[in-house]
Each structure stands twice: as structure tokens, then as C-alpha cells.
Amino acid sequence: MSREEVESLIQEVLEVYPEKARKDRAKHLSPNDPALEQSKKCITSNKKSQPGLMTIRGCAYAGSKGVVWGPIKDMIHISHGPVGCGQSSRAGRGNYYIGTTGVNAFVTMNFTSDFQEKDIVFGGDKKLAKLIDEIETLFPLKKGISVQSECPIGLIGDDIEAVAKKKAAEHETTVVPVRCEGFRGVSQSLGHHIANDAIRDWVLDKRDDDTSFETTPYDVSIIGDYNIGGDAWSSRILLEEMGLRVVATWSGDGTISQMELTPKVKLNLVHCYRSMNYISRHMEEKYGIPLMEYNFFGPTKTAESLRAIAEHFDDSIKAKCEQVIAKYQSEWEAVIAKYRPSLEGKRVMLYVGGLLPRHVIGAYKDLGIELVGTGYGFGHNDDYDRTLKEMGNATLLYDDVTGYEFEEFVKRINPDLIGSGIKEKYIFQKMGIPFRQMHSWDYSGPYHGFDVAIFARNMDMTLNNPCWKKLQAPWEKAEESAEKVAASA
């Protein structure tokens, strides 16, 4: 589509809104301009959603517990409030981990204070204290506790910090209070920030004076990889094959001990910039640890990132980097040769969180799939700054897109594939459009590194599945047949 066509499409879709809402939403929709250095000149982001519009965003609690803290496997994360929030954020993303669930790993379990009406009236501090005591008795191998506040906790003013300090001293364990009530901020993005700040204040400096850990010149951490489908494991294999030592993964398959040791590494490798840039910036300022954003989606971007990482180290690492790329090159070239012919020329629209709308573009390009629209649910303008240059001219950009807008854009652009979240999945599948869930890889994966065969296979089996040709209702077929008979008469 040309720039004029995209601008016309945006105006058509916005016509149904009242004038005030139409003017506000127009700021969040734009054709892409790769020449721009600052995205704020074309699109507005990280603003409060308009009341009455069906936003697809999540809340601060989801950003903290569901994204940052939840995958830390050897801690118990208490969802402090009514039971529903904890249950809805439990085991939904496929954060893989090594350990025995319920013994020394707790990622897929739901620990809740199960707030009731009486707790709202009388407060929940005593209940929280009792819950921590029970955890100490029942789960002796856990290494720490986090308290993830839900909305009622902030509304009634419970002092979870005081409870955390008291119980941490009493049980000689780490107890981290996280003020991530869902009403805070405009999206789950503030939950990421709050979670990062809680790690900074309650965890990160615990081993600053500990000299027992032997460091090497090749120590790195993987930050912002949540090990969905085993992503962090695939990334770790490549980094270790090129001679680096991965000290910590944040937070997929991660531990509290790894987090405490991270200030001792030489380089922080940041995959999901949006959710983990805050703690990475803090470590850069306090400990002098440089951070580097990298992209392990698709073989082209993976090879580029490996070479960029190697530039931070000596010639031995650079040489091993080239050996690693050469080792896997024939494999990924064979995969692309197999799948690209059936995917070439297909078009995809994306709407995800704060990373994937730009990071997966290269993976689709490797397979010959064209991006025709993308947007962030909780991205900031620095995310869009990085996105503009990855996309073609006049590609449709949409920020905090509403359910109505997304459906209308899809109807008019008619993409071959949509990549978004679980809330959108069934709407578009019922419209007969192939869909991939890009928050959990539809419980597949890994997608990171040179495991390109899994990504390619999933796109191929979705796009070229014969079921899409069988979705026409019988009465619609009858109408078509009648029209053909009438036309031939």
C-alpha cells in the first residue's frame, strides 16, 4: 500500500469514533517513515487508553508477576490479593525450567493469599505474615519469596514492606515486596519497571562484598529472555560454544542466586529491552557493566548479533564466533530452502508487546514473508525508534490498537497471517485467517538462535494448512452454486 492509501485507511477506520476519541486515536496510528530518527514525530505511545475503547493491554501486576518475577524458579511468588489474578498469570507462557515442581522449583504453581471481603475491611498484613510462615514450613528448599501486590492491597494501604522486612529477619531469607497493583500506570510496562526496581532495592546488591565467586573475562548474563519454549537454552548454547560463560539468565530458568551474581559479569546481553532495560541501565551506572541489545530471532539476525557480541571480547572469541556460525549455516540454509518456496510472498500483520513487533521481522524476512503492519501494546517511543528502520516505507503502524481497529485493519489489508496474543487468536481464526500466538509460541518453541526449523515449520503448517479451505458454511456454498447456475443460464 502507498502512504496515501494507508492514511486513507486510517481515516476510514476512525470515522466511527466521536470527534475527541477520533483525534486521540489518530495520534497512535501512522504509515511508517524509515527516514525519521524519532518516532514521536509520527506516532504517540505509552499513553493511557481511552475509557470505552477495548484495549488489548494488560496491567502492572501482569508485567511484574507474569513477565519478570514469575519465571524465577527457586522463589515462591505470592499473588497477594483475590485468587483470580494469580490463577490467570500461572503457567500461561511456557516458561521452561529445570527442577522438581513443588520441591525446588515453583514457576507453574499459584500461591495466593485469597483475599476475601473481611480482608478488605480488616487488612491483610496478618494474613500475609501467616502465609509466609506456612511457606517456610511447607517449602524448605525455596530460596526466597516475592509478594506481588494486586489492586486491593494498594487501595486499602497494607504495609507489605513492613511484613517483608519482619519475616525476612525472622526466617533469615529474602522476602521482596513488589508494589505492582494493577491500577498503576497505563499498561504492564510500569509493572516491568516496578519489578526491576524491586530487584534493584531488595536483591541485586546482596553479594557485592562476596569475593568467593571466581570471575572470568568472558562472563555474561542473558537479560530479558523468559525461556519460552526453551529460548534461553538455545541462546545459552550458542554463547557458550563461542567461549563465553553465561552466569545468569533473567528470568527464564533463572534463580535468585544468579540475579545476585549478575553485577560481577563483564557484559549484560539484553533481549527484551522493554521489560529489562531499567535494571540493565542501573547496573551500567552503578557497576560499570555495559549493556548490549541483541536479536536471536531468525538466522540472519542471530549471526549479526553473535558477531556484535564477539566484538566486546578478544580475538579468540571472535574466531570461535565464526566457527559457531559456520557450524550451523548448512542446517539453517537447508531449512530455508525447504520452507521458503511455500512461504515466499505471504504477508503478516503483528501486534504484540514491547519487543516482538520489531525483533521477529528479520525471521519473517528470512522465510520470504512480508510485514504489512505492526504495533506495540505497551511500547514506548524508543521502541518505535528501533522499529521504523526495520520496516518498509508506509507500512501500517498502530499503537495500543483497539479490538475494533485491529479487526478493521485486517479486513481491509487482508494479510495471510496474523501474529498476536491469546485474546486475539480466536477472533481471527473464526474470521478464517491463519494465526500464530506470539506470547507463548502456541506452546511450541524454541524460536531463538539457530533453531529456525521450529519457527519455519510452525509458520508453514499454519499458513498452508488445508483446513482454511474448508471454512465456508454449507449455506454459503449453496448460494454460490445458485449464483453460478443463474449466471450460466
Swiss-Prot record:
Give binding positions for [8Fe-7S] cluster. Answer: 59, 85, 151
Query: Which catalysed reactions does the entry list for this protein?
Result: N2 + 8 reduced [2Fe-2S]-[ferredoxin] + 16 ATP + 16 H2O = H2 + 8 oxidized [2Fe-2S]-[ferredoxin] + 2 NH4(+) + 16 ADP + 16 phosphate + 6 H(+)
The record's annotation in SUPFAM superfamilies points to:
Helical backbone' metal receptor
Report the record's disulfide bonds: none
Ranges for region Disordered: 21-44
**Cellular component terms per the entry's GO annotation:** molybdenum-iron nitrogenase complex
Describe its assembly. Tetramer of two alpha and two beta chains. Forms complex with the iron protein (nitrogenase component 2).
Q: What is this protein called?
A: Nitrogenase molybdenum-iron protein alpha chain
The organism named in the record is Alcaligenes faecalis
